[in-house]
Each structure stands twice: as structure tokens, then as C-alpha cells.
Amino acid sequence: MDFLTNQNIVFYLLAYLIGSIPFGLILAKTFAGVDIKSQGSKSIGATNVLRVVKQTNPSLAKKLGIATVLLDALKGTLVLLVGIYYGVTNETLWAIAVLAVLGHCYSIYLGLEGGKGVATGLGVYIVLIPYSTLIGAVVWIVCAKVLKISSLSSLLGLIAAVISAIFIYNGLGINSNIPMYLIAFIILYKHIPNIVRLIKGQEGKVI
């Protein structure tokens, strides 16, 4: 099967192992001396980096938050771009994308714990469904400005990206939307605690 060639297996391993790198945790420990795994939401994502570091150094918190978003997004983007360079199939690219997000959310370096996948999902979506990702990003920015709730804004942006992709990229070039839905499901699943707090009106404003 072309899907399981030696070259593709290398890409799958790279996608998961690079996706597993907890950049938020590394940046917060290195530059702010804090362990975000034991504070705030205990997530390794940019929102928790911002939340925790902001308590002692607001200006540094913004810089580290931005750096975390960029690095987490690049975890997915770079492996996909290398895969495109080597001419792997669309099926393989989507498998790489799913594994990169899984790596971030269930990091092998953190005992299969991790972040919530938003930035890494953004990184893979922008390569594979760019127009829909831009639509989702616009929705996220508008909601963030109005609602000032990171989790809700991220989820609304994700939903907008997926719905628009159904019309713009239906089939994803592989006659199936399943990989896109799977990435969205992983991100939504990791946000269940946030969704529960939103329903109860207890979700804090971070943005």
C-alpha cells in the first residue's frame, strides 16, 4: 500500500514526535521560570502560557503567548510542507496532519498529556484548506474582540473553518472529509472542560 511506504512511515513518526514537542511548557520554564503544567488550566497551550506568566510579567506573557502559537502551528505546517516537497499523496498529507495534532494533544514526552490542539490544527489546516482556515481565523479574531473568551472564540473559529471547507474543499481531494472532521473532533474533545464551564457561565476571560 502506498499509504504505508517506508517514506510515509517516516513522515508519520516525524509528525507525531514533532507535534509532541511542548513548546509552551519549554518557553514558560526557560524564560519565565514557571511550570504551566502545574498552574492555571495545566494545559501546554498559548492561552495557559499567557494566563500563568501574566501574573508576574504581563509584557513577557504576551511575547511568550505569541511565540507559543507560532511554534505550535509550525509543528504541523513544516512536516506537511516537507511532505509536499517530496510529493506525498493527499491521503498521506492528511494522515500527517492528524498525527501532528494528536502529538500536540497527547504528547509522548508528557505521558500522553498535552494541549488542546488549536494552534497545531491551525497550522495543518492553513496548508491543506487555506481559504477555509482564513475564514475561521477571521471568525476567531472577531469573536475574540467581542467575547474575550479564548476557548469559545477558538471553537467558533474551528466550526466556521470546517463548515466553509465542506463547501469549498468537499472531499479534500481524497473523496472524504473524515480527516478534517477527525482533527476538529480531537480539538473539540480536548475542550470539553471548557465547554462545561461555558455552559455554567464559569469560563474566564483571557484575551
Curated annotation (Swiss-Prot):
Subcellular location: Cell inner membrane
Keywords linked to the UniProt accession: Cell inner membrane, Cell membrane, Lipid biosynthesis, Lipid metabolism, Membrane, Phospholipid biosynthesis, Phospholipid metabolism, Transferase, Transmembrane, Transmembrane helix
Membrane topology summary: Multi-pass membrane protein
One GO cellular component term: plasma membrane
Biological process (GO), any one: phospholipid biosynthetic process
Pfam families: G3P_acyltransf (PF02660)
Pathway(s) the chain acts in: Lipid metabolism; phospholipid metabolism
TM stretches of this protein: 8-28, 64-84, 92-112, 122-142, 154-174, 176-196
Catalyzed chemical reaction(s): an acyl phosphate + sn-glycerol 3-phosphate = a 1-acyl-sn-glycero-3-phosphate + phosphate
UniProt-listed Enzyme Commission number(s): 2.3.1.275
Annotated GO MF terms: acyl-phosphate glycerol-3-phosphate acyltransferase activity
Family: Belongs to the PlsY family.
Function, in words: Catalyzes the transfer of an acyl group from acyl-phosphate (acyl-PO(4)) to glycerol-3-phosphate (G3P) to form lysophosphatidic acid (LPA). This enzyme utilizes acyl-phosphate as fatty acyl donor, but not acyl-CoA or acyl-ACP.
Subunit structure: Probably interacts with PlsX.
UniProt name for this protein: Glycerol-3-phosphate acyltransferase
Species this protein is from: Aliarcobacter butzleri (strain RM4018) (Arcobacter butzleri)
